Amino acid sequence: MDKRIFGIETEFGISYSSPDSRPLAPEEVARYLFRKVVSWGRSSNVFLTNGSRLYLDVGSHPEYATAECDDLAQLIAHDRAGELILDDLVDEAQARLAAEGFNGTVYLFKNNTDSAGNSYGSHENYLIPRRGEFSRLAEILIPFLVTRQLIAGAGKILKTPHGATYAFSQRADHIWEGVSSATTRSRPIINTRDEPHADAEFYRRLHVIVGDSNMSETTALMKVGTVDLVLRMIEAGVIMRDMRMENPIRSIREISHDLSGRALVRLANGRQLTALEIQQEYLTKVTAFVRENGAHNPHVPLILDLWERTLKAIESGDTRSIDTEIDWAIKKKLMDSYRERHGLGLDAPRIAQLDLTYHDISRSRGLYYLLQSRGAVRRLVDDTVIKDAVDAPPQTTRAKLRGDFVRRAQELGRDYTVDWVHLKLNDRAHQTILCKDPFRSVDERVDALLDSMG
């Protein structure tokens, strides 16, 4: 597919710290966080004027699902817009708590694990053609996704019986299956539940739940952009070497724990390859494919360049060439510098605090955004574009229809219901519009509905 629909769903960690008032459980804090949402949406599960979905997921995790995007920079802008929306809710919740005598601080983290060992995810969605065998796609994709943490991991201090170590991925130790229709119970690499949110005759939705949440815009580009390129190869029928793994769940952990990239992976055919060799194989194939077929979007040259530089940096052990662009390397540089200045080990509480605060979405408090304000990380999207995405949907996908409908209904105080494919005015019989084409941003039926609303 030359054009593809993308989406990212992010679950956020939430906590509350107060020196002089009673502690609040995450569930209580989440209720304060969503009180404003419930007041206008009558629910903690709403669609916004920018086409996105905002809701409370299982337990106490706020979740933001971007609108449908057909460009990677657009996707990153809408993912970042979700952070701004939630950060605004944090300010509202903080004020409400203070008015009720709670003088603590609410924190939202865009990470994947908490101190109790719980994991929450970053799920990627890719529209793929219905044609073709899904099992073949999964066989080719899983070895790539297991090793993708080298180029897209968020980094994490891991406590082990042998002491603290730094790992590529936050999510790797919490994945339990290769493919499954469950998301929370078994945490597979690929979720197979067939909910295309599009015309099921032509499309299917690939739901990847193995990835880390990314603070870095360039790492987010790598996470999604490399999958897009590998999918294009598979869809074009490119023959790949058989790299099916004997035990992908064991391998994903062993790879995460070895920053040299040389963790050996036993394949189903008995051969052994390192994580670096597997990634290099995909990079070589993708590069040849792009050379033969051309770049299908303007981001491809950067993706291929950063992919190659990251693998070379891991191989050499010198990450200076990527420590403004790849999350795990950015964070490691920050920690190494702090440890050196203060003579601290990796297991020091202050280093654990750095590990966490890197993911704080607060623009005034989070360490990643402190680095960004100093020009210490590479940008892809202007702040003005991100701010526009807080209110405005992507103009090139179905999200425009949904966002425009939600905005008009809210302005006029009309009772409505929406989901990914339906638009409905509840105060009119037979006023449900089914929007099955996610690429379609103009629809005469929706125009007529908006006009009829006044």
From Swiss-Prot:
The keyword Calcium does not apply. It catalyses: ATP + [prokaryotic ubiquitin-like protein]-L-glutamate + [protein]-L-lysine = ADP + phosphate + N(6)-([prokaryotic ubiquitin-like protein]-gamma-L-glutamyl)-[protein]-L-lysine. InterPro entries: Pup_ligase, Pup_ligase/deamidase. It is an enzyme of class 6 (ligase). Its EC number is 6.3.1.19. The active site is at D57. Pfam families: Pup_ligase (PF03136). HAMAP family: Pup_ligase (MF_02111). The reaction mechanism probably proceeds via the activation of Pup by phosphorylation of its C-terminal glutamate, which is then subject to nucleophilic attack by the substrate lysine, resulting in an isopeptide bond and the release of phosphate as a good leaving group. Belongs to the Pup ligase/Pup deamidase family. Pup-conjugating enzyme subfamily. Catalyzes the covalent attachment of the prokaryotic ubiquitin-like protein modifier Pup to the proteasomal substrate proteins, thereby targeting them for proteasomal degradation. This tagging system is termed pupylation. The ligation reaction involves the side-chain carboxylate of the C-terminal glutamate of Pup and the side-chain amino group of a substrate lysine. This is Pup--protein ligase. It comes from Pseudarthrobacter chlorophenolicus (strain ATCC 700700 / DSM 12829 / CIP 107037 / JCM 12360 / KCTC 9906 / NCIMB 13794 / A6) (Arthrobacter chlorophenolicus). The lineage of its organism: Bacteria, Bacillati, Actinomycetota, Actinomycetes, Micrococcales. The gene is pafA.
